[in-house]
Amino acid sequence: VAAAQMYLADVEGVIGYKPLCFAQFPYTGIAFSYAANTFITDSAAAGTALASGKKTNSGMLGMLPDRKSAAESIAEMAKKAGKKVGIGSTVCINHATPGSFYAHQLSRNNYHAISNQLAESGFEFFGGGHFSSAHDRRFDDGGSYKVAEDAGYTIALGYDEYKANAESADKIILFPQQE
């Protein structure tokens, strides 16, 4: 913000700062984005805090620092309340930030387990990059796509497939069309 205010002042030929409009708002909020165990957080701990309002250790996804208790997300609360839930992301859908809304893992790198928890969530919509580590050979379950389909998800590759299937699908996952 300070750099933008200095740049704006320089463009107008003024030495110093030219306040941006939001810097003049009458109220200010302060957020502390550190993890429970480190001053600098990662996206798993930050996503967990965003999704649940609870701090956790870096690297942990949807779990409390005691390493035993799940941090219930607002998306899970909405689902329990009978609401339809959708999760959208620009990254792989089983990465830390989107995963923090439906998964509970001691390691953000448990992509296979995170994918399985996506399928178990019952959320009606997921959209994002494909599954990371979708075909982990250590597991004999057919991979993340098959697990999701076996759980009743329709997988749409691209917007045209989404439009063709959205009305009839109870649960759908939208991924970019592969070239």
Spell out what each predicted region is.
Residues 176-179:
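Active-site-adjacent mobile loop/cap segments within catalytic or ligand-binding domains
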Residues 1-137, 142-166, 170-171:
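N-terminal catalytic scaffold of extracellular/periplasmic and nuclease hydrolases
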